Amino acid sequence: MADCPPGKEFVFKMPDGRVVGRAKNVAELSNLIKGAPLEAVLYHAKGKHFAPWLMMVGERAAASRINALAINDKTVRVALLRVLHS
């Protein structure tokens, strides 16, 4: 899996803007989704922030599947990880 271009990392943030991590590839994004505060995961999932970045790194199918997810506070982490690992 390829790294994104320098400066194009996915910046994982809390809703108040605090940065909680950065990912330069899908594996790092997956690790952030696993370990980041749920509030940050929901912020990005509800804001549909994952799909554009996935498209940029060439993961078109994953981007499409993530955009189609119904965001549920209790299952969002598992649903996102399932898409990224399929």
What is each residue range found by the language model?
Residues M1-S86:
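Terminal, compositionally biased segments used for targeting/anchoring and flexible tails
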